[in-house]
Every structure is written in C-alpha cells, then in structure tokens.
Amino acid sequence: ASSSCESSGRRRQGFRVVQAEECWYKSLAPLMAAIRAQAGSGPIYLSIDIDGLDPSFAPGTGTPEIGGLTIWQALEIIRGCRGMNIVGGDLVEISPPYDLSGNTALVGANLLYEMLCVLPKVQYRS
C-alpha cells in the first residue's frame, strides 16, 4: 500500500500508479496490454512485492494488507510480461518468522519460477 503523497511523487516521475482497488473483480490482461504498449522494446525490471498479494494467499510478510491481489492476478501480471525485454527482476518482502504455514514461501517460489519462464529467449511449448 502506498500513500497518496508517494503515489503523486511517482506520477511526477512518469510512473503509472495502479491502486489495488482498481484491480478488484477483474482480469489484469487489459492492464498488461497497456503496459506492453507503453514499454515497447525498452528494458523492464520486474519486481514483485509479496505484500501486494492479499494475506489470505501470502500471510508471511511484515506488512500484510487486506484487499491485495489474488494469485491469479499475480500470474496474469507475470505472464503478461512474456516477450518483453526483461533485464532483471526480484521478489521481496517474504518474512519467514511470519510464514508459519510455509504458504508464503511456496507462493514466492512459484512466482519466481513463473518470472524465470518469461525471461527473454526462454523457449515455450505450443
């Protein structure tokens, strides 16, 4: 979650800010199509912050916020990056002391795997 002050600062720097509420109850495929069009062939750094997911999916973080993205939406974002010029990426904010069930680590590992699958030059089966 970010404050409106942080969001306005990011907008001034040219970032597009999408609040979680704008993503509720919908596919993120149209958003990813717009991002792909805007990014073109430019370099992309893909960063996933686990606390952007709803804590029902990933409770093991220091800053859980209800109303976050679903697992399916996170996958739409990552898979929507296929074919883009990804130059790096990361997944942050998993906190093992708060991950009592291990679910967050499992979600994080799967999302990292998905991120590796969309790197340039990865071969896909049809």
Locate the predicted segments by residue.
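Active-site glycine-rich loop that binds ribose-phosphate moieties when present
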Residues: A1-C5, W24-S27
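Active-site-proximal loop/helix segment associated with metal-binding centers of metalloenzymes
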Residues: S2-V18
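Catalytic cores of soluble, metal-dependent hydrolases
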Residues: R16-S126
